[in-house]
Amino acid sequence: MQVTAPRTVLLLLSAALALTETWAGSHSMKYFYTAVSRPGRGEPRFISVGYVDDTQFVWFDSDAASPREEPRAPWIEQEGPEYWDRETQISKTNAQTYRESLRNLRGYYNQSEAGSHIIQRMYGCDMGPDGRLLRGYEQYAYDGKDYIALNEDLSSWTAADTAAQITQRKWEAARWAEQLRAYLEGTCVEWLRRYLENGKETLQRADPPKTHVTHHPISDHEATLRCWALGFYPAEITLTWQRDGEDQTQDTELVETRPAGDRTFQKWAAVVVPSGEEQRYTCHVQHEGLPKPLTLRWEPSSQSTIPIVGIVAGLAVLAVVVIGAVVAAVMCRRKSSGGKGGSYSQAASSDSAQGSDVSLTA
């Protein structure tokens, strides 16, 4: 896992519930946490971000003037004050837990107090069309490198080095994986279903991409063809170039999918082609919002104008989202208090979406 936080960038089953709905495709809920130490400049900064699919819905920053769990999507604002008080308290407690973990890991690696260090965690669940758990995950990084991760069996750990093995032994003694599994199979999926219902107009939509091909001469002999996909949701999309029907994957420059700033995404794929041979190249676009895949060619008589303003806005939002795409801590033990709204289960009403307790220190 790769990270950044403030200045560094992170590039890291409820069987008893009677199911009355199904969802198209799979959906996910993820939490991303980052803690960054800054010697001589106060306590470490702690940031947490929650996502349902590709939509950010909550945010917490310990550096805020009055740190609170904050809504980042209209549909989450309907949760009652008990929800926000509970989530705020969990995030504040986690901020302290991560400060302790930063001290512990600095000791494990025999590092001085002078440098800045980062802990990241990402956890969450993927849910299938039947509303049940597809997979759960929990991953940790330290200073941008893998540290420890929960295996796919949700009962064992993979430690990256001898320092991480110290954490592994602590967590095995505390039976931490069992608690995580209970959260991932139960509470996580229940809250995800609740959020998908409450935010179905936005979370379960499929906006097709607006597509075009642009032409950029490099020299008298070569030009770049760039295939654009703009304004689509969800983020999953496939762009491929072909020459006379043969894939040009190895010769394609493909950027990561980027947020556009309006709750949609953008992406492009480019190939360098010999001048005069542009019509031998086709761009192929596949997305959930399209009734069938698109095939595009460059049209010399109608050179497309690139919507620069939207792309620049998307890059600005990307900087914010990348800070938000930081990795996370799981809180798994259940406790009953709070939560309004939702009709799926008592657990979803009483337990925190993040889990109801703070995580163990590393």
Swiss-Prot record:
Disulfide bonds join C125-C188, C227-C283. Keywords: Disulfide bond, Glycoprotein, Immunity, Membrane, MHC I, Signal, Transmembrane, Transmembrane helix. Residues 25-308 are extracellular. Residues 336-362 are annotated as: Disordered. Residues 115-206 are annotated as: Alpha-2. One of its GO terms (biological process) is antigen processing and presentation of endogenous peptide antigen via MHC class I via ER pathway, TAP-independent. Residues 209-295 form the Ig-like C1-type domain. One of its GO terms (molecular function) is peptide antigen binding. It is found in: Membrane. Residues 25-114 are annotated as: Alpha-1. Residues 299-308 are annotated as: Connecting peptide. This is Patr class I histocompatibility antigen, B-2 alpha chain. It comes from Pan troglodytes (Chimpanzee). The lineage of its organism: Eukaryota, Metazoa, Chordata, Craniata, Vertebrata.
